Swiss-Prot record:
Gene Ontology CC terms: plasma membrane
Similarity remark: Belongs to the L-rhamnose transporter (TC 2.A.7.6) family.
Keyword Cell cycle part of the UniProt annotation: no
Keyword terms of this UniProt record: Cell inner membrane, Cell membrane, Membrane, Sugar transport, Symport, Transmembrane, Transmembrane helix, Transport
Catalysed conversion reaction: L-rhamnopyranose(in) + H(+)(in) = L-rhamnopyranose(out) + H(+)(out)
Record organism: Klebsiella pneumoniae (strain 342)
InterPro entries membership: L-rhamnose-proton_sym_RhaT (IPR004673)
Protein name: L-rhamnose-proton symporter
GO MF, one example: rhamnose transmembrane transporter activity
Annotated gene: rhaT
Functional note: Uptake of L-rhamnose across the cytoplasmic membrane with the concomitant transport of protons into the cell (symport system).
Origin superkingdom: Bacteria
Cell compartments where the protein resides: Cell inner membrane
Transmembrane segments: 4-24, 38-58, 72-92, 101-121, 131-151, 175-195, 214-234, 259-279, 290-310, 323-343
Length: 344
């Protein structure tokens, strides 16, 4: 496995670790509605940071975006909005299926759809099926899905042991939402594929290849922001017990604390895709579709490890922790299989 591929896998791991931790600051926000908190974090992660970093990287910010026609920008924006719909469905999936089953089904589906649909759309799938490297990377996807399934099983054992149940368990509704969440969340992978002309244009302007994908986030995350912020603003306007005015009528120190914590959560959310761009740039072009598989499987891996560090599994017993450990090992094996496949 060469150095570039190793670093690509490493950067995806760092990005996934940030994704697994980003909600921790949000949990410390007090006396704010989820909608206000999520909006503040979202404005930082989907609007301020993509625009600020792109303005820093590009020699002429507006000229860069004006150089693309609508046929290039619209699919990128719409795939970003597609991801935004999946993001909203994610929370509803947890509500009706519980954390473990919801995460397992939604992440498993988005891993498969987001990874495999890209080479199918690009007409590369048959080539992958008939080359040694392609076969190994596809095997890595299968092993990763198995690893996600094992971690999901560990979560179910933990929830059963600790008496944790879904807020409003509804298998039929939950499964439908999990499938929708898995498919729509893959929009981020499709958006990155559609944004390749934007990446190439940024590189042609002298932007370092590691950063070349970042200017496309203005459009991708703009689509996601439209859906997420629209959802939050509509609820804040229509739901009687939600009030932005009330949220900002708290004591000034608490408002400042909530703003900083929400902004920190937004920063950590953005960093997952900052490092995703680095990992994506380090992987051979013919295997760039594997970025999504690495990100999502490492997300599950890091989520399990973060749970152990935060002692969320302390009262779960030995068996759930053993199953979790096995799942984490399987995901690590999957990443190595993918790395060897890309290097062959």
């Amino acid at each position: 496995m060469n150095h570039a591929i190793t670093m690509g896998i490493f950067w995806h791991l760092i990005g996934a670790a940030s994704a697994a931790c980003f909600y921790a600051p949000f949990k410390k926000v007090k006396h704010w509605s989820w909608e206000t908190m999520w909006s503040v974090g979202g404005i930082v992660s989907w609007l301020i940071l993509p625009w600020a970093i792109s303005a820093t990287l590009l020699p002429d910010f507006w000229a860069y975006y004006r150089s693309f026609n609508a046929s290039t920008l619209l699919p990128v924006f719409l795939f970003g909005a597609m991801w935004g719909i999946g993001n909203i469905n994610y929370g509803l999936t947890m509500r009706y299926l519980g954390m473990s089953m919801g995460i397992g089904i939604a992440i498993g589906i988005t891993l498969i759809v987001g990874t495999l649909m890209t080479p199918i759309i690009n007409g590369q799938f048959s080539v992958l099926m008939h080359t040694q490297g392609g076969q190994m990377t596809l095997l890595g996807v299968l092993v990763a899905v198995i690893g996600v399934g094992i971690v999901t099983r560990a979560g179910q054992l933990k929830e059963r042991k600790m008496g944790i149940k879904a807020e409003e368990f509804n298998l039929k509704k939950g499964l439908l939402l999990a499938v929708m969440c898995g498919i729509f969340s893959a929009g981020m992978s499709f958006a990155m594929n559609a944004a390749k002309p934007m990446h190439d244009a940024a590189a042609a302007l002298g932007v370092d290849p590691l950063y070349a994908a970042l200017p496309s986030y203005v459009v991708i995350m703009g689509g996601g922001a439209l859906v997420n912020l629209g959802f939050c603003f509509i609820r804040l306007a229509k739901v009687k017990n939600l009030s932005v005015k009330a949220d900002f009528s708290l004591a000034k120190p608490l408002i400042i604390s909530n703003l900083l914590l929400s902004a920190l959560g937004g920063l950590m959310w953005y960093l997952q895709f900052f490092f995703y761009a680095w990992g994506h740039a380090s992987i051979p072009a013919q295997y760039d579709y594997m970025s999504w598989m690495l990100h999502m499987s490492f997300y599950v891996l890091c989520g399990g490890l973060v749970g152990l560090v935060l002692k969320e599994w302390n009262n779960a017993g030995r068996r759930p922790v053993s199953v979790l450990s096995l799942g984490c090992v399987v995901i690590i094996i999957a990443a190595n299989i993918v790395g060897l496949g890309m290097a062959s």
